[in-house]
Amino acid sequence: MQIQMLLPLVQTLAQQVADQEHLDLVSVQWLTHQSPPILRVEVRHPENDTSLEDCERLSRALEMALDELPEFEFAYVLEVSSPGLSDYLSSDRDFDAFRGFPVRVTTTAPHRGKTLWEGNLIRRDEVNVYLNQRGRSLAIPRSLIASVQLYTPSSEP
């Protein structure tokens, strides 16, 4: 069985272990260009900064669970870490945490004639991302959005 085909199984197991350890699972990926292959798992604490102890706890529990699976009869390296702070927003948690912060939205196609929008993040729902631009609300369809990134506005003299 190819290692990449095990990814759904690993994601499910990692989610169960993360839930037991009261952590949020951020991502699971195989780095198969390494020998042995690396299983990289990123987690974050839902309320506090993610500690080394959080990562160690999850690593031990996940390693024990993986060792029980007959599909894991091969050598691999398990890496568990925190994703750190990215300046790109992607999850609901990111959008909630950075409400009111200045963001730069890039679209894949023009929206109202532009592909780059800046403003303070109001919120995101199922359909749109909302920005405050000088006191006016702007809705940008999520279907057009390529990225939403935190940025520091330059001060104008």
From Swiss-Prot:
SUPFAM superfamilies linked to this entry: YhbC-like, C-terminal domain, YhbC-like, N-terminal domain
InterPro entries linked: Ribosome_maturation_RimP, RimP_C_sf, RimP_N, RimP_N_sf
One of the Pfam families matching this protein, by short name: RimP_N
Keywords recorded for this protein, A-Z: Cytoplasm, Ribosome biogenesis
Gene Ontology cellular component annotations, sorted alphabetically: cytosol
Gene Ontology BP terms: ribosomal small subunit assembly; translation
Residues forming coiled coils: none
Localisation per UniProt entry: Cytoplasm
Keyword Cytoplasm: yes
UniProt keyword Lyase present: no
Main function: Required for maturation of 30S ribosomal subunits.
Similarity-based family: Belongs to the RimP family.
Protein name, entry field: Ribosome maturation factor RimP
The species this protein was found in: Thermosynechococcus vestitus (strain NIES-2133 / IAM M-273 / BP-1)
Organism ancestry: Bacteria, Bacillati, Cyanobacteriota, Cyanophyceae, Acaryochloridales
